[in-house]
């Protein structure tokens, strides 16, 4: 109230208005609390009072009053809360999304949503009509729907309006008397005026249609005058009992102008929707009632059960027939038919829900029941006004009891079914049927059918009972039921898989060990309801794992042509492919050429080592077109000697930026406007493109126009606007630099493009030629960007020397073109070398007798440089079309791109071996063994092929691939055998083509047929037949290997059934898949129900990333009993869900191999190598079988689900079967951590006081490609808040009226207050500055302790120091009060080696505090330098914090989450000491600040050893004078003093071992600080001296390891924090 108002009130003699009111807060679980609050206090203060009164820990509460959510920043008076009013305190998360349960989000990309218009209800329909756009005013904003809103996805039409033309819910009227139509809600007189904010977008249909009924009534005298008619209608409406008072008042009437019709407008009725729990309860009621009537019908007199029992007695007594007449038999059959009709009628009634709610309200007519049952939801910008009906526990309990009663009755029927199965009733009756229709057999069939049908129904009912648990936590009765939704468990522990050095041992169910002849070890589980036409398909041969060789894909089909019919006989060799034009003979020639290449690579590999390199599992496919450009392997991009192109230039993690962040001004680029620190290639490209000058863009556009200015490229872009050109350059830079395998390579590519405009123009031209001409982006972009002096886009005339008739390479599609990637390959213009190599290969084949000796006719035609197309392409270009028609593809080259290995010296005795599990085409399986040995004849046949097995999968099965990549890169010479002469350099790393491979038996029998059987000569017909079979079999392999479609697409389900494998994918005969079908869960345990229950085993195994109802969870429905759930998680064993692995003593996984530091595997001889190959094959086959099992289990349509998505299946295989190992840097870091931890095990005390891990000296690990991210909240925000809290201590101590903290807290404040300024207290929040402050003031503090606490005495004994510390520490009553305020904490806990030995909590807390005080007293007596003194101070404080943390950890049963919750009770206890009462202002802010300190403490100090803590308590209880300083001095101080006696110790050498160049200066003076020392920590419990991480000076360790016999908590972020 203002002063003027107060004077007027006093002048009038009116009493003063009250300034405080009493408000009652009520929660959803019926807890109430009455608080007193001022009218000018905020709603947030009211929430805080309610949380404190009801002991609510979470901070997501809102106040609801008058049907609306109050703003927390409003005052109580402004919110309209009066004295004595009751408001609701509810839990609501920070996100306001999806406060309505059943909302269908707008996910249509095209249409838009009209925003709220003042004066009209907020619209929500999606208008797709073009005419509607003309009706919208010009000033109305039409925003696009938000893309990040996550609503509960519910199908918009849950109940159809009609089924087969019959209305379901719509009322039917007589069209002769009543005219029915629907009009928009806008324009009606009852339309409310609800202004909406312009920025709020609605996503629900808040503008419904108005159903208008026009009743034609004959005009009569009884309706005159008109006012009498209106009065009659009004009175009739008011007397209707089923209308509410608000509805009666909202009725409006209006006559038309002629007073011939009266419009009666009823107000909209707010809908009542059931809660999820009530929906489940009603379904359970409906099915329970159905189950009761079902059992009654079966058990009625002379019913189905009686007939079944009669048949059972006949079977037991072996009575074959009864002497019944035919009429009696027919009567029994008719009686059974009547039972079937009645049961089917009962099942048909399940399609309509009964009105159980009406029955419940009749039984319970109290206001309390109605208030709990119906909950009103006010209108919001997203939701209309509606009511939600809840399920109450009193309703659930009765339904549960009735269901269990009927379930026991049904159990007796199941026992009868088991009796029939035991005696074989069906077989007995079926064998003795004498009539056409036997009533006995029909009775058994009916009983079997309906019992199984009801079993499935009961399984759903049993599942619903788990969702309707009555909570036992809240004592109120009755109470609402919240369903047990599934939730994502926060399991931060990574899954540890026991592996050997290289390969993971296979699982028992998929292990091929001990199998013979390729038996499939495990029969995959097929979910129920799999369609029989899928199961009964024709068997197909499983593809066996083979090594890949140089090959090209076999054409998909061969067609009989005119040339095949020669002389009345069929010539299979003339069969041609209609797409590529190849014949079988051409394909065989191409395969023979590759076999020659294989033989040429055979010699010189004996005695070599095997090096395992990581290869990606996917393929990159590229084509080169008609005139492929020959890329040039060149030097790295140009650069100065001081800054070479391939080395790291700066340590600022910036992309080619000088330390001053200003780029040089060049002819092409403008200077850097701001400091650029890009994190992704797209941002790099946009930043670089923003610097392009206008004249440079014009020059590039002109160059590109010139390059394309010919017949085939008539594209002029030089007239484009600058903004378009800049975007084009940005996109080109992004795509071109993405070709790099690493970040450094991408940086080099960006440098080369920026420094030379000609390089950029040439690269864009080549890529556009490949992209627009053939639809594929080239994979050799890196070699296009970095040439030496020759252009890569020149015309190359490849001549066909393999084909006799064809001399021009443009029309010869079977020629194999290789893209050279080695400097030894012919360069761009060296066409003579290309012709010589091909002529030599042709001569080699003629000498081997593989092809007839004919002369080749090389072409001498010269073609101009530039893109080349044939005559058809030129015609298309003239017509304005791109050359992308339906003509067959030109010469295609498939490249398998892998990251380039590190450069090493060539050695012919080194073998680079790559094992990959992928889906490629395969070569003969005998090929790896032939490559691994020396001097193996080329005619050696491989082992027999794998047998054909039945594959239920309608999709290709999983295959395995071994890629034996021969390369000459090694830095270690062979030791076992002398090195043979080095062979001629070959293009071993060149991209290889892909061919469909022959079978094992037919791979090399054409090479030299006389070797195996000299006297045998095969006929041409036999050779042709064998080759045709070989090609057909290779075609099947090729189709299965290259299949990359969507498994969910039914058009690809079975390519071997009608309408045939050659049917186009867009053929209308192929069945399409509905988009709205749900995706089947990956783990098919209970596949017939889509379950979202949090107890469901499907969710526990699959752990989905987002559940269907995940956005509407409340705290009660997520975790009704959080402590009990945490208790269960602590007791659950940490084991894998997958099948167990094979025994560790298996001979294939029980040996060791040699591994170098660089990751290479070294073998002494071939005897060591052969077991390794066997292990590799065994592991690979097991992985293939696991993947095949996942595919088989998830690719079939089952009831209610469609086949799983192909991409999701691949993700499952990658994540759960073939897990990608970590990077080498990560593995090395973990190995270093393990070695450091092992070194510190000799000193238990050093485990607690260990320091950060020393950085490795390996230069490859000196700079990470991606700098580690900084958690701004943990590293900046929270330490800043803690610094403000420490600064507040100065203000607190300045006021003498504030109570002084007792014990250790007052002791520390007395030492620091008066010496440390506010800035010094703020410096204590971070480690780097806290050590500086301690080193500056440690001498003064130690002198103060000697003068005031030790009375100037020195040389005190340990017992005397202990006595002084006991007097300074808090007494046991201080800790007893804290324990009395927290009843959930135990008063004692076990410790030591004997678990029957208990210690009192109060006593242990006090001993920990005494130990810290005694450490400070001891330090004041020692003559130490500043560095050692600060080190001992930090170690003592760390020990104090560790021990208190372990105390809470023990009291909370080693539950980390519960420990963090209980530690916040310290904040409440401090608040009671500080404020002495709970209603003081500012107490909530005080508690929140200290809660942040507790969270920071528990998160930082996670790596502790319980063994050291037990040792401390045992020593103290035994009477030993424990002194941390004496113990640490004996271990660390004496060696340090001895080593530094000859040279004075500096703070930089004694305080920190990671940052040796950091001078001990205050960090506010601008000195440089090392990143490794920047750990922001704080010492809780008001220590004020160190709040650092436990990682201190001497010992070196990290990670989440605890010592043996201890079980300290660990989180995923511990290693990162400790390394910092």
Swiss-Prot record:
Residues 852-871, 1225-1242 have a biased composition (Polar residues). This is Uncharacterized protein ZK688.5. Residues 799-810 have a biased composition (Acidic residues). Residues 1537-1556, 1583-1620 have a biased composition (Low complexity). It holds the Pfam family ubiquitin. Signal peptide: none annotated. It comes from the Eukaryota. GO terms for biological process: ERAD pathway; signal transduction. InterPro entries: Death_dom (IPR000488), Ubiquitin-like_dom (IPR000626), Ubiquitin-like_domsf (IPR029071). PROSITE patterns: UBIQUITIN_2. Residues 621-648, 791-810, 842-874, 950-1016, 1219-1260, 1537-1620 are annotated as: Disordered. Residues 21-96 form the Ubiquitin-like domain. GO terms for molecular function: misfolded protein binding; polyubiquitin modification-dependent protein binding. GO terms for cellular component: BAT3 complex.
């Amino acid at each position: 109230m203002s002063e003027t108002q107060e004077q007027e009130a006093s002048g009038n003699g009116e009493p003063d208005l009250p300034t405080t009111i009493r408000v009652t807060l009520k929660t959803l679980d019926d807890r109430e609390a009455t608080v007193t609050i001022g009218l000018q206090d905020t709603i947030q203060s009211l929430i805080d009072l309610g949380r404190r009164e009801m002991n609510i820990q979470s901070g997501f509460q809102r106040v609801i009053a008058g049907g609306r959510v109050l703003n927390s920043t409003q005052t109580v008076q402004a919110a309209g809360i009066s004295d004595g009013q009751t408001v609701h305190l509810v839990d609501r998360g920070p996100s306001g999304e999806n406060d309505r349960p059943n909302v269908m989000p707008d996910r249509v990309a095209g249409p838009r949503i009209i925003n709220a218009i003042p004066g009209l209800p907020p619209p929500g329909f999606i208008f797709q009509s073009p005419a509607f756009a003309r009706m919208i005013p010009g000033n109305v904003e039409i925003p696009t729907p938000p893309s990040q809103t996550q609503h509960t996805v519910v199908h918009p039409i849950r109940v159809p309006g009609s089924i087969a033309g019959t209305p379901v819910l719509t009322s039917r009227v007589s069209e002769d008397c009543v005219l029915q139509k629907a009009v928009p809600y806008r324009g009606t007189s009852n339309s409310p005026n609800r202004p909406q904010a312009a920025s709020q977008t609605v996503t629900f249909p808040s503008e419904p249609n108005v159903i208008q009924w026009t009743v034609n009534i004959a005009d009569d005298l009884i309706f005159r005058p008109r006012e009498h008619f209106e009065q009659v209608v009004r009175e009739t409406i008011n007397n209707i009992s089923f209308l509410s008072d608000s509805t009666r008042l909202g009725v409006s009437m209006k006559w038309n102008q002629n007073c011939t019709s009266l419009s009666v407008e009823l107000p909209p009725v707010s809908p009542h929707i059931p809660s999820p729990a009530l929906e489940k309860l009603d379904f359970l009621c409906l099915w329970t009632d159905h189950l009761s009537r079902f059992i009654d019908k079966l058990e009625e007199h002379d019913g189905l059960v009686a007939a079944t029992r009669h048949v059972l007695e006949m079977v037991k007594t072996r009575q074959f027939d009864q002497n019944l007449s035919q009429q009696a038999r027919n009567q029994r059959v008719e009686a059974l038919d009547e039972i079937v009709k009645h049961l089917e009628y009962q099942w048909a009634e399940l399609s309509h829900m009964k009105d159980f709610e009406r029955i419940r309200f009749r039984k319970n007519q109290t206001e309390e029941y109605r208030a709990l049952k119906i909950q009103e939801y006010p209108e919001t910008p997203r939701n209309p006004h509606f009511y939600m009906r809840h399920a109450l526990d009193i309703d659930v309990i009765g339904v549960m009891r009735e269901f269990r009663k009927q379930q026991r009755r049904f159990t007796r029927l199941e026992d009868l079914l088991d009796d029939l199965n035991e005696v074989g009733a069906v077989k007995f009756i079926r064998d003795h049927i004498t009539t056409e229709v036997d009533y006995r057999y029909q009775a058994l069939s009916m009983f079997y059918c309906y019992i199984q049908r009801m079993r499935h129904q009961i399984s759903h009912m049993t599942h619903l009972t788990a969702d309707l648990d009555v909570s036992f936590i809240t004592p109120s009765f009755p109470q609402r039921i919240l369903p047990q939704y599934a939730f994502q468990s926060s399991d931060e522990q990574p899954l540890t898989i026991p592996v050997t050095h290289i390969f993971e041992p296979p699982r028992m169910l998929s292990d091929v060990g001990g199998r013979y002849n390729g038996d499939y070890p495990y029969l995959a589980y097929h979910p129920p309801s799999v369609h029989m036409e899928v199961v009964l398909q024709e068997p197909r041969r499983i593809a066996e794992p083979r090594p890949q060789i140089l090959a090209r894909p076999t054409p998909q089909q061969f067609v009989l042509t005119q040339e095949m019919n020669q002389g009345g006989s069929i010539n299979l060799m003339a069969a041609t492919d209609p797409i590529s034009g190849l014949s079988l003979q051409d394909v065989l020639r191409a395969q023979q050429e590759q076999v020659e290449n294989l033989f040429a690579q055979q010699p010189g590999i004996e005695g070599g080592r095997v090096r395992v390199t990581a290869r990606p599992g996917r393929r990159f496919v590229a084509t080169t077109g008609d005139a492929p450009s020959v890329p040039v392997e060149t030097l790295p991009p140009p650069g100065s000697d001081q800054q070479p192109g391939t080395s790291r230039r700066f340590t600022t993690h910036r992309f080619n930026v000088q330390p001053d962040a200003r780029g040089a001004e060049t002819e092409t680029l403008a200077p850097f406007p701001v400091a650029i620190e890009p994190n992704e290639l797209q941002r790099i490209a946009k930043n670089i493109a923003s610097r392009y000058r206008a004249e440079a863009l014009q020059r590039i556009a002109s160059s590109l126009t010139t390059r394309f200015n010919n017949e085939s490229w008539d594209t002029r872009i030089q007239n484009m606007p600058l903004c378009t050109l800049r975007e084009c350059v940005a996109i080109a830079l992004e795509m071109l630099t993405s070709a790099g395998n690493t970040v450094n390579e991408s940086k080099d590519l960006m440098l080369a493009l920026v420094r030379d405009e000609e390089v950029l123009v040439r690269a864009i031209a080549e890529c556009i030629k490949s992209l627009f001409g053939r639809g594929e982006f080239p994979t050799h972009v890196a070699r296009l960007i970095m040439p030496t002096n020759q252009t890569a886009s020149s015309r190359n005339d490849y001549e066909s020397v393999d084909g006799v008739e064809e001399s021009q390479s443009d029309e010869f599609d079977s020629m194999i073109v290789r893209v050279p990637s080695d400097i030894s390959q012919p360069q761009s213009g060296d066409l003579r070398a290309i012709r010589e190599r091909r002529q030599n290969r042709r001569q080699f084949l003629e000498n081997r007798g593989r092809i007839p000796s004919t002369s080749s006719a090389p072409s001498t035609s010269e073609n101009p440089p530039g893109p080349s197309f044939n005559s058809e392409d030129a015609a298309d270009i003239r017509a304005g079309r791109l050359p992308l028609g339906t003509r067959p593809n030109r010469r295609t080259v498939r490249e398998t791109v892998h990251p380039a290995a590190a450069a090493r010296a060539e050695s012919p005795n080194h073998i680079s071996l790559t094992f990959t599990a992928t889906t490629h085409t395969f070569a003969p399986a005998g090929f790896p063994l032939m490559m691994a040995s020396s001097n193996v004849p080329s005619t050696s046949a491989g082992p027999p092929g794998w047998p054909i097995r039945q594959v239920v999968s309608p999709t290709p099965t999983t295959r395995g691939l071994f890629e034996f990549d021969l390369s000459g890169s090694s830095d270690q010479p062979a030791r076992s055998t002398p090195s043979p002469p080095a062979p001629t350099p070959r293009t071993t790393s060149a991209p290889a083509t892909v061919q469909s491979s022959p079978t094992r038996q037919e791979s090399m029998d054409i090479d030299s047929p006389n070797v195996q059987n000299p006297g045998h000569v095969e006929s041409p017909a036999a050779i042709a037949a064998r080759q045709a079979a070989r090609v057909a079999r290779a075609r099947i392999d090729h189709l299965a290997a290259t299949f990359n479609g969507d498994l969910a697409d039914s058009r690809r389900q079975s390519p071997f059934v009608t309408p045939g494998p050659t049917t186009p994918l867009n053929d209308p005969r192929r069945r399409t898949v509905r988009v709205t079908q749900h995706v089947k869960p990956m783990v098919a345990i209970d596949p017939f129900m889509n379950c979202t229950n949090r107890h469901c085993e499907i969710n526990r195994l699959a752990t989905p990333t987002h559940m269907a109802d995940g956005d509407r969870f409340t705290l009660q429905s997520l975790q009704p009993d959080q402590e009990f759930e945490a208790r269960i998680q602590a007791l659950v064993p940490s084991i894998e869900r997958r099948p167990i692995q094979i025994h560790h003593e298996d001979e294939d996984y029980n040996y060791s191999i040699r591994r170098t530091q660089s990751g290479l595997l070294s073998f002494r001889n071939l005897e060591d190598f052969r077991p390794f190959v066997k292990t590799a094959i065994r592991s690979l086959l097991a992985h293939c079988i696991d993947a095949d099992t996942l595919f088989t289990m998830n690719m079939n349509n089952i009831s209610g689900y469609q086949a799983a998505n192909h991409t999701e299946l691949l993700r499952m295989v990658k994540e759960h079967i073939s897990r990608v190992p970590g990077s080498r840097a990560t593995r090395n870091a973990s190995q270093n951590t393990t070695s450091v931890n092992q070194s510190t095990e000799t000193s238990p005390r050093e485990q607690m006081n260990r320091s950060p891990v020393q950085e490795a000296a390996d230069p490859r690990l000196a700079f990470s490609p991606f700098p580690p991210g900084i958690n701004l909240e943990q590293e900046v925000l929270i330490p800043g808040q803690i610094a403000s809290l420490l600064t507040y201590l100065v203000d607190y101590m300045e006021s003498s009226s504030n109570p002084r903290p007792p014990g250790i807290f007052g002791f520390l404040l007395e030492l620091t207050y008066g010496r440390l300024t506010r800035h010094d207290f703020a410096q204590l929040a971070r480690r780097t500055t806290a050590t500086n402050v301690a080193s500056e003031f440690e001498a003064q503090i130690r002198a103060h302790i000697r003068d005031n606490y030790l009375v100037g005495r020195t040389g005190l004994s340990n017992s005397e120091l202990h006595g002084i510390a006991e007097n300074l520490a808090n007494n046991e009553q201080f800790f007893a009060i804290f324990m009395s305020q927290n009843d959930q904490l135990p008063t004692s806990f076990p410790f030591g080696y004997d678990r029957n030995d208990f210690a009192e909590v109060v006593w242990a807390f006090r001993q920990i505090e005494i130990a810290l005080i005694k450490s400070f007293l001891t330090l004041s007596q020692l003559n130490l330098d500043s560095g050692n003194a600060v080190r001992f101070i930090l170690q003592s404080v760390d020990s104090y914090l560790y021990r208190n943390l372990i105390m809470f950890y023990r009291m909370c049963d080693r539950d980390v989450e519960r420990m963090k919750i209980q530690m916040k009770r310290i904040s409440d206890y401090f608040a009671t000491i500080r404020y002495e009462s709970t209603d003081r202002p500012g107490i909530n802010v005080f508690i929140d600040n200290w809660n942040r300190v507790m969270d920071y403490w528990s998160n930082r100090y996670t790596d502790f050893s319980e063994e050291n803590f037990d040792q401390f308590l045992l020593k103290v209880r035994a009477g030993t004078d424990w002194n941390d300083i004496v113990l640490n001095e004996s271990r660390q101080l004496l060696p340090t003093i001895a080593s530094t006696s000859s040279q004075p110790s500096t703070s930089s050498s004694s305080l920190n071992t990671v940052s040796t160049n950091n001078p001990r200066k205050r960090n506010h003076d601008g000195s440089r600080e090392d990143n490794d020392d920047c750990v922001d920590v704080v010492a809780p419990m008001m220590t004020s001296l160190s709040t650092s991480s436990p990682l201190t000076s001497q010992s070196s360790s990290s990670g989440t390891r605890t010592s043996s016999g201890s079980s300290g908590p660990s989180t995923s972020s511990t290693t990162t924090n400790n390394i910092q």
